[in-house]
């Protein structure tokens, strides 16, 4: 693989910005459209676009191989559909900056599953990173502990957000197994098609007609975001080291906070400012530091000589 650091960084940054801005746009659409319908449109547009691309490149997955991996693909579809639905639903109860802080639970969930299923070893840097993640989350929610005392609107949103991040691990593990026979784009195509089929009975297509001009713009962006985010992510991995791309991706929650402030500044009537105190901002930074340490800590911490 030819290294192109500048292009790799650019695509990784586009990915982080796309994923960071997504919940802000989603929240606008959710005021008119239910989560199932939004998710179906996102999946079907991504699936059709990717199908056309792979057909043009003559790289469509072989049917025989697809049948061999049907059960694994089903697990992945369940994980991805649940992730999209739970994350979108959480925005009905909590603000985007809170929903996005849980994104790193997915990567740590993958690490733990790697230890339990594939017998991989958890490095010291990953253990410290996990510790920082927990500390950071505690700081982030420093003024919200009372909200977790019972099942209320806020705690419901948090439960949905955490559930969405953790269930994504099922997709991540399925993808890891399927990479033995398919490339990443072929896997995404199969997952997108499977998810679109799963959500079709639940989608209410008439809700598109009820979108306001702002909600329509946000809706179109949400649909394109899947292609922009995952497409840029794939291009970044083709041009730059995985560990370096991962570091940039850890900035997603910070971009969500930044974009929330920018959106509120330009249109306070439509976009709410993040309700975070100074300790919460520190907590968000600590969460990101924990994720960065987990991604590249092996290069920062001294190795033992054997």
Swiss-Prot record:
Keyword Transport in record: yes
GO terms for cellular component: membrane; plasma membrane
Annotated transmembrane regions: 6-26, 35-55, 69-89, 98-118, 122-142, 154-174, 186-206, 211-231, 247-267, 281-301
InterPro entries per the UniProt record, alphabetical: AA-Vitamin_Transporters, EamA_dom
Membrane topology: Multi-pass membrane protein
Annotated keywords: Cell membrane, Membrane, Repeat, Transmembrane, Transmembrane helix, Transport
SUPFAM superfamilies reported for this sequence: Multidrug resistance efflux transporter EmrE
Subcellular location: Cell membrane
Domain named EamA: residues: 17-142, 166-296
Family indicated by similarity: Belongs to the EamA transporter family.
UniProt name for this protein: Uncharacterized transporter HI_0878
Source species: Haemophilus influenzae (strain ATCC 51907 / DSM 11121 / KW20 / Rd)
């Amino acid at each position: 693989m030819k290294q192109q650091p500048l292009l790799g960084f650019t695509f990784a940054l586009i990915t982080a910005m796309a994923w960071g801005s997504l919940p802000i746009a989603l929240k606008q659409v959710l005021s008119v459209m239910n989560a199932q319908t939004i998710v179906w449109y996102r999946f079907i547009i991504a699936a059709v676009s990717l199908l056309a691309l792979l057909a043009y490149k003559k790289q469509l997955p072989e049917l025989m191989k697809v049948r061999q991996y049907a059960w694994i693909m089903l697990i992945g579809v369940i994980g991805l559909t649940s992730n999209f639905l739970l994350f979108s639903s959480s925005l009905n109860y909590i603000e985007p900056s809170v929903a996005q802080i849980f994104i790193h639970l997915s990567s740590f969930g993958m690490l733990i599953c790697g230890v339990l299923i594939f017998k991989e070893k958890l490095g010291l840097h990953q253990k410290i990173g996990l510790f920082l993640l927990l500390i950071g989350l505690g700081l982030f929610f420093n003024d919200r502990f009372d909200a977790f005392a019972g099942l209320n609107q806020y705690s419901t949103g948090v439960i949905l957000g955490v559930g969405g991040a953790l269930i994504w691990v099922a997709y991540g593990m399925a993808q890891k197994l399927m990479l033995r026979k398919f490339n990443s784009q072929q896997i995404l195509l199969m997952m997108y098609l499977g998810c679109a089929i799963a959500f079709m009975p639940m989608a209410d297509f008439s809700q598109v007609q009820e979108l306001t001009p702002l909600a329509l713009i946000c809706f179109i962006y949400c649909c394109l975001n899947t292609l922009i985010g995952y497409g840029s992510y794939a291009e970044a991995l083709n041009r730059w080291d995985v560990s370096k791309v991962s570091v940039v991706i850890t900035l997603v929650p910070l971009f969500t906070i930044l974009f929330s402030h920018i959106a509120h500044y330009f249109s306070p009537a439509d976009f709410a400012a993040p309700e975070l105190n100074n300790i919460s901002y520190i907590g968000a930074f600590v969460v990101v530091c924990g994720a960065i340490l987990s991604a590249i800590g092996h290069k920062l911490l001294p190795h033992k000589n054997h």
